[in-house]
Amino acid sequence: PNCKTEQLIDDMCEVIGVDKELIIKNKENSGGAQYIIKNTDSNFWKKVYEDSTEMYHKMTIFQKRYPLKKGSVQTWTAEMWSLLWNLWKLGHETKISEELDFVWGTDNIQKFFEKPILHMAGVTEDMKYRKFFKGDFINKNPIQLLKEDINYFNFIEPKSITIKYVDNMKSFIQKPKIDYL
């Protein structure tokens, strides 16, 4: 990391109140955002929330002053770092598990059965005419659109792993309704 990136890491550590050496020591035990968390309480989650908000704010200000290169830490990950670093600060051990590994929305459909989770991330706006782009559905419901037109997503490439996500939504709306009365 360059000097500017080092400063950002220092600022992030300051928010949590954690020593940077602890972060460096545990680097190999930091992964994505799939967690199984035990032995925490409401005070822990309150601190994670408050720290992530402050960290996001600091990261945003930093990014405006010193635009980071592609592949660097991104502001939207503030909550992930807050959670992870607060766990480490309290002495919790973290491990990366293949059981929580995932395939990306940008992957080819052949990878679908290789990992247990389909993480609908990575698809960018320039890909939205070939793959399912969740960014188009912040204020629209894709299931409702499928109810109105079952072929709504027919533009998705058959080899795109995102077709599995669409297939899942289709199966949801095609399930028979059960009358329990």
Which functions belong to the PLM regions below?
Residues 1-181:
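Glycosyltransferase catalytic domains, chiefly GT-A lineage
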